[in-house]
Amino acid sequence: MKISNLLAAFLAFSGGFFCASAEVPKVNKEGLNELITADKVLMVKFYAPWCGHCKALAPEYESAADELEKDGISLVEVDCTEEGDLCSEYSIRGYPTLNVFKNGKQISQYSGPRKHDALVKYMRKQLLPTVKPISKDTLENFVEKADDLAVVAFFKDQKLNDTYTEVAEVMKDDFVFAASDDKELAKSLGSNFPGIVAFTKDAAQDSDKLVYTGDWDPASIADFIGVSSIPLLDELNQMTFGKYQQSGLPLGIIFYNSTESRDELYDVFQPLAKKYQDTLRFAFLDAVRYGAVAKQMNVESDWPAFVIANLKSMLKYPFPTTELTAKAMTKFVGDFVDGKLQPKIKSQPIPESQEDLVVLVADNFDDIVMDETKDVLVEFYAPWCGHCKNLAPTYEKLAEEYSDDSNVVVAKIDATENDISVSISGFPTIMFFKANDKVNPVRYEGDRTLEDLSAFIDKHASFEPIKKEKESVPAPDLEDQVAVEDEMADEL
């Protein structure tokens, strides 16, 4: 691929760039910042050389970069084994990660198919107008053609236009956006001027129009659109779970095992879904197909069943019986909203004794990890995870190395059998909880060798480390680090 004139100039005169191959330029922090500022549309691949998924993506990414060059769209890459600070700055948690920038800002993280055609189509879409002008005559057709939520704003002010366009740029992959300066049209839809109306296809709503009444700022408008797009009472599956998770609202999950049961439960929960639509959402889950999710939600496998899950903290509030009557559900949901319920925490038994490698469970996690007199390194693992098994002998040796240091704890926890408040996106995940800063744990992103893990502890330690003399331990086989979604998403 011929590199564009702009990139060629940067390569020649800026120390921020160097060529990874003839196809896709590799950039460091300085070079990436220059590109973000200069390029109208840019995709950045954050990767690791050892990552199998990254290797599979490489030819597709290179061919897409070649085709998109004529459109003035740049595709570049960042090697996270060389640019660790840069990857941390962008909160890279797995490889490959594809971030998209437009007009100097990150607008999205690409999650579509990692194929040439899909990449090209997605990036060319970024060049299209984000907000479509609309009139009274074209409104109906605009709304009907929308696959999901259709958002229409009414204003004349340029500042309001800039704010609305900023939101639309970030959310345009999921929704369609239009704008009008017609005051009478806004009034006929029940909106103020300026104002925003979201058109929904949710049958559980009383109206197909949701009117925004909040402040005209990007965060508030985005929250309104995000929440409006989530059905009040829908089916939970692989396609819809992400929406519920991204909303930030607690989710009431209704387990059913027959069509008749679902129909009866709809009548019970639909009024509650409408009443509490600003507070939580509700969804049905087929217990015959997805019964294993009940275990993750701390629910007994008796149907029907109901649980409210906080998808941020992953705290679960299961209803204790199968008697899901309107009266019982009204009280239970009301008590949750009023903060009267206590979550049910799943925990393995606390070990009677501990070795050099401390075993954590949910019931002792805070006592050990949040101890402000200790630095604590924690491995979050799954018993079935091959990478975790490969790491085990090295991690045990690491614990032995720091066993004489009373200020350092090396620990592990089975994240599949214990409820934890830490967000885990893959196994193993290793985090360092500093004695003087428990709120901001440091995620380990390096090679899983004894030397690198030990250096990581020493770098971030709150105290002068005291270690036993080390014996050499062979590095575990670092095959492709496969990021795994959280347990519930896997089951779905």
From Swiss-Prot:
Its main location: endoplasmic reticulum. It holds the Pfam family Thioredoxin. The active site is at 51 (nucleophile), 54 (nucleophile), 385 (nucleophile), 388 (nucleophile). One of its GO terms (molecular function) is protein disulfide isomerase activity. It is found in: Endoplasmic reticulum lumen. Residues 23-128, 323-462 form the Thioredoxin domain. Disulfide bonds join 51-54, 385-388. PROSITE patterns: ER_TARGET, THIOREDOXIN_1, THIOREDOXIN_2. Residues 477-492 have a biased composition (Acidic residues). Glycans are attached at residues 161, 257. It is an enzyme of class 5 (isomerase). Residues 468-492 are annotated as: Disordered. The record marks 448 as: Lowers pKa of C-terminal Cys of second active site. The record marks 114 as: Lowers pKa of C-terminal Cys of first active site. One of its GO terms (cellular component) is endoplasmic reticulum. Belongs to the protein disulfide isomerase family. This is Putative protein disulfide-isomerase C1F5.02. It comes from Schizosaccharomyces pombe (strain 972 / ATCC 24843).
